[in-house]
A protein has these predicted regions:
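Beta-strand-rich domains and repeat architectures in extracellular enzymes and scaffolds
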Residues: 1-27, 41-52
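Short coil/turn segments that connect the beta-strands within blades of beta-propeller domains
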Residues: 1-3, 56-58, 101-103, 149-151, ...
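Short, conserved, GDST-rich strand-edge loop motifs in beta-rich repeat architectures
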Residues: 4-19, 65-66, 109-110, 156-172, ...
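A short loop-to-beta-strand structural motif that recurs across blades of beta-propeller domains
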Residues: 22-26, 73-75, 117-119, 176-179, ...
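Short loop/turn segments that connect beta-strands within beta-propeller blades
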Residues: 29-33, 78-82, 122-126, 182-186, ...
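Surface loop/turn motifs at the tips and blade-to-blade linkers of beta-strand repeat domains
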Residues: 39-44, 87-91, 132-137, 191-196, ...
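Repeated scaffold domains used in trafficking and secretory/extracellular systems
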Residues: 45-52, 92-101, 137-147, 196-204, ...
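Blade-level signature of beta-propeller repeat domains, shared across WD40, Kelch, NHL, RCC1
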Residues: 271-273, 280-322
Length: 322
């Protein structure tokens, strides 16, 4: 079952962050053609709310922190009962969480480390197995599961190279490599390298195509959607009529439908859209209320999808103290 999930962060008082913020996870209900809240909880003010859902067991995994913490830890919540567990007790920074074939994966920087790297989380021992604990130079970005290759798609660059005079003062572009990495983290297959532009996000569209959002330089200019032909290594821009900028996206497994967070021409608000590459049909997907900040968009493929019958799981402040 293919499920579209959108992560947003809303101000609890509806106006500003004075009273804190909450993580809200929406799932798109194809039957009603509407977003429905499946999970809501207050989160720490410094947290990047990485999350993923195990729909078979109706459990959400998410990064959060107690009010006095400036670092992340991993939590789980049973969507049926609201039971919350804190699964780690360290100083982490999570960029991505993925649930694939019954296993929880993370892209995470652990305590005393600068860079994020892929890790596999053992739910029984509640411990991480990292790709390479000795490597604190390689940044791993845009961690996603590639259903076509049955491996992970990853974007990497060197922290040391990023800080060189050539990159920091001249090009302002981090040389990056798009690669496949298997579930053991031992076998890596490079697919594409460039330092002609800054790659922000990558996702597999079909057998021979990767889509990516790019910027002319680091944190500079509007994001552009590009298409990479893996075989020929040719790159071309993908223009979406009526859209001035695509910030993040996720393709459907049909190889044609693209879900993305973007800005319409002449607008400043970010919205979620569905776009058909063949017909160029563009549809805005609406929320019950406009989110304060759209953080992430992802598509999961699992044996089952959301169970809307038990409604939304809403946690109060004490959920963070368990």
């Amino acid at each position: 079952v293919e499920t579209l999930l959108v992560t947003v962060v809303d101000n609890i008082n509806g106006e500003n962050t004075d009273d804190g913020v909450e993580l809200v996870i929406y799932a798109y209900d194809e039957q009603s053609q509407a977003f429905r809240v499946i999970f809501k909880t207050p989160i720490g003010p410094y947290v990047y709310p990485a999350n993923t859902v195990d729909f078979e067991h109706q459990i959400v995994y998410y990064a959060s922190a107690r009010p006095d913490e400036t670092y992340d830890n991993l939590y789980s919540c049973d969507l049926k009962t609201g039971n919350v567990q804190r699964l780690t007790d360290g100083k982490n920074a999570f960029n991505d969480l993925l649930f694939v074939d019954g296993t929880l994966y993370a892209n995470v920087a652990r305590e005393f480390c600068t860079t994020c790297q892929p890790a596999r989380f053992d739910l029984d021992s509640q411990t991480f197995t990292y790709r390479n604990e000795a490597d604190d130079d390689t940044w791993h970005h845009s961690f996603s599961y590639d259903d076509y290759a049955d491996e992970f798609l990853i974007l990497t660059c060197s922290d040391a190279e990023m800080r060189t005079h050539r990159v920091a003062a001249e090009t302002h572009i981090r040389p990056k490599t798009i690669s496949l990495i298997d579930a053991t983290f031992e076998n890596v297959t490079p697919l594409f390298f460039t330092e002609d532009f800054e790659i922000c996000l990558t996702r597999r569209l079909n057998e021979n195509t990767i889509l990516m959002t790019t910027e002319p330089q680091m944190v500079s200019g509007k994001r552009t959607l590009k298409r990479l032909d893996i075989t020929s290594q040719e790159v071309e821009n993908v223009a979406i009529p009526g859209i001035q900028q695509v910030h993040m996206f996720y393709p459907s497994l049909d190889g044609n439908t693209l879900y993305f967070v973007g800005q319409a021409e002449g607008k400043t608000i970010w919205n979620v859209y569905r776009y058909a590459l063949d017909t160029q049909e563009l549809t805005q997907l609406t929320f019950p209320k406009q989110p304060d900040r759209i953080i992430d968009i992802q598509i999961t493929h699992q044996p089952c999808g959301p169970d809307f019958s038990h409604g939304c799981c809403v946690l109060e402040d004490e959920g963070l103290k368990k």
